[in-house]
């Protein structure tokens, strides 16, 4: 296990951070494709279309070809939301990390090992938190595939916890998709609670929609105070 350190983001980290973020998002595409295939509406669609071709044209070969191209199309479509998200982030908060995070009452950290950036996480104040709450939102938690299983992700989340606690925040919140099961497992193991769920990432609105889960971690002292 190679040693690592967590430090605040510096401008020289930019290319490595963006590369790690982009690769991490693309890793979710196979899981998104598998998730898509198991949806009832997808299975129905894959059954009805070839059956229609057999009934209309009487050709099983044409039906098999249809299934092949439908699967190929679904594979391409499954990756589009993640590609769009990366493109959006690179035009917004990730375009200038210093301005978006460090100069906006938040912060951004990297995990460094062997001179390379192997993990990232950011935190920003929530603009309109619930009444009586002061919340920080966690963004862009990512760890290089070669450095997972070393506790880096947990250490990065704890770094956000410490920063938020020191700044007087009552909660840390975040959002992630149902596709990212390893992230969901991590957050729940660290004490985050599911506080909401909504559908946002749509491949084809009438066919496939990925749900977004909202998580909240409330600091124990805050919970005791409310009691």
Curated annotation (Swiss-Prot):
Family: Belongs to the camello family.
Location of the N-acetyltransferase domain: 69-213
Protein name: Probable N-acetyltransferase family 8 member 5
Superkingdom as given in the UniProt entry: Eukaryota
Lineage of origin: Eukaryota, Metazoa, Chordata, Craniata, Vertebrata
One BP term from GO: negative regulation of cell adhesion
EC number(s) given by UniProt: 2.3.1.-
GO terms for MF: N-acetyltransferase activity
Assigned keywords, A-Z: Acyltransferase, Developmental protein, Gastrulation, Membrane, Transferase, Transmembrane, Transmembrane helix
Native organism: Mus musculus
Enzyme class, UniProt record, top EC level: transferase
């Amino acid at each position: 296990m190679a040693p690592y350190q967590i430090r605040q983001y510096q401008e020289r980290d930019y290319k490595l951070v963006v590369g790690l973020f982009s690769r991490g998002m693309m890793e979710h595409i196979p899981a998104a494709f598998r998730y898509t295939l198991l949806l009832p509406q997808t299975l129905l669609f894959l059954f009805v279309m070839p059956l229609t071709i057999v009934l209309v044209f009487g050709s099983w070969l044409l039906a098999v070809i249809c299934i092949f191209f439908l699967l190929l199309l679904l594979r391409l479509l499954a990756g589009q939301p993640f590609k769009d998200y990366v493109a959006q982030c690179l035009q917004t908060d990730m375009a200038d990390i210093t301005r978006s995070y460090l100069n906006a009452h938040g912060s951004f950290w990297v995990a460094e090992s062997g001179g390379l950036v192997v993990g990232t996480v950011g935190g920003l104040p929530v603009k309109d938190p619930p009444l009586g709450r002061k919340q920080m939102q966690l963004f862009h938690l990512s760890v290089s595939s070669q450095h997972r299983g070393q506790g880096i992700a947990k250490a990065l989340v704890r770094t956000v916890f410490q920063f938020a606690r020191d700044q007087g925040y009552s909660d840390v919140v975040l959002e992630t998709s149902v596709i990212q099961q390893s992230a969901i497992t991590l957050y729940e193991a660290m004490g985050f609670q599911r506080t909401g769920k909504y559908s946002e990432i749509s491949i084809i609105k009438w066919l496939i929609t990925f749900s977004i889960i909202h998580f909240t971690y409330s600091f124990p002292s805050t919970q005791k105070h409310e009691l």
